[in-house]
UniProtKB/Swiss-Prot annotation:
It is found in: Cytoplasm. HAMAP family: Recomb_XerC_XerD (MF_01808). Its main location: cytoplasm. CDD domains: INT_XerDC_C. This is Tyrosine recombinase XerC. NCBIfam families: PRK00283.1, recomb_XerC.
Length: 299
């Protein structure tokens, strides 16, 4: 079973060209299923049936796994069995018809506009780390990149003259994104310092040793910036969420935001409309002359 799982992961890496982040997540999920099979004395993927897979889902849910995590696990299982069926190693899919337990969908955390400006408009020292980190923060917020997209960004994907960046998103889909003025300025100040490290490849963001920054290193630098400038925990996806929320709030163009984020399904983008409604409700509560009386009226 493990050998077939290894072959499937290699298929995802070499043929499907999924990102390292996605591949790692799928492997973790499928390792959980494999471990469950071993404990249940299930000796092959063919022997795993819907009843036993349902038992695993119920067990993980009872242990606190979110509906979203379980949905991803089931998606990974379906992908594995699609591959096994194609390779004539199995003739069924135990995940067919299975759905994760419904859970309350959490709204993404964002910075409000003032906090985003506070993060980005602080004084920036003229040194390697400060200039690099500022360019990272500005690009996340300006263009709404995923962490994997920024990590994999190469010089030939940047067109600062026209203010555009081409990114490779999920499913190896490319999209062209605008780069705002402040982000362009930050990149223009960073790139000469980058060149001094004699980088080993074409990565836009490198370490002081000239090596491409990995996802973990970028997460750490964003977290440090959040603690220093805002006194709060900050992660790259919060900047992407903030980009989407602020753009939707200003433009009210859901389709445009979907395209910029690279969402294949507009339902994924629609969660930001709930954030926009929260903002409108807060404005109403603070500004409408009847709001306070209505909020305090228990009758």
């Amino acid at each position: 079973m493990e050998r077939q799982l290894d072959a499937y992961c290699e298929h995802l890496r070499s043929e499907r060209q999924v990102s390292p982040h996605t591949l790692s997540a799928y492997r973790r999920d499928l390792d959980k299923v494999l471990g469950w099979c071993i404990k249940q004395n299930i000796g092959s993927w063919q022997a795993l049936d819907i009843q036993r897979l349902r038992s695993l889902i119920a067990r993980l849910h009872a242990q606190g796994q979110s509906s979203r995590s379980l949905a991803r696990l089931l998606s990974a299982v379906r992908g594995l069995y699609h591959y096994l069926n194609r390779e004539c190693l199995c003739d069924h899919d135990p995940a067919t018809g299975l759905a994760p337990p419904k859970g309350e969908r959490r709204l993404p955390k964002t910075l409000d506009t003032d906090r985003a400006l506070q993060l980005l408009e602080g004084a920036v020292e003229d040194d390697f780390l400060a200039r690099r980190d500022q360019a990272i923060l500005e690009l996340f917020y300006s263009s709404g990149l995923r962490l994997s997209e920024l990590t994999g960004l190469n010089l030939d994907q940047l067109d600062l003259a026209d203010g555009m960046v081409q990114v490779l998103g999920k499913g190896s889909k490319t999209r062209l994104l605008p780069v705002g003025k402040k982000a362009r300025e930050a990149l223009e100040q960073w790139l000469p310092l980058r060149a001094l490290t004699n980088p080993s490849d074409d990565a836009v963001f490198v370490s002081q040793q000239g090596r491409r920054l990995g996802p973990r290193a970028i997460q750490v630098r964003v977290k440090l910036a959040g603690e220093r400038e805002l006194g709060q925990n900050l992660h790259p996806h919060m900047l992407r969420h903030s980009f989407a929320s602020h753009l939707l709030e200003s433009s009210q163009d859901l389709r445009a935001v979907q395209e910029l984020l690279g969402h294949s399904d507009i339902k994924t983008t629609q969660i930001y409309t709930h954030l926009d409604f929260q903002h409108l409700a807060a404005v109403y509560d603070s500004a409408h002359p009847r709001a306070k009386r209505m909020k305090g009226d228990d009758s």
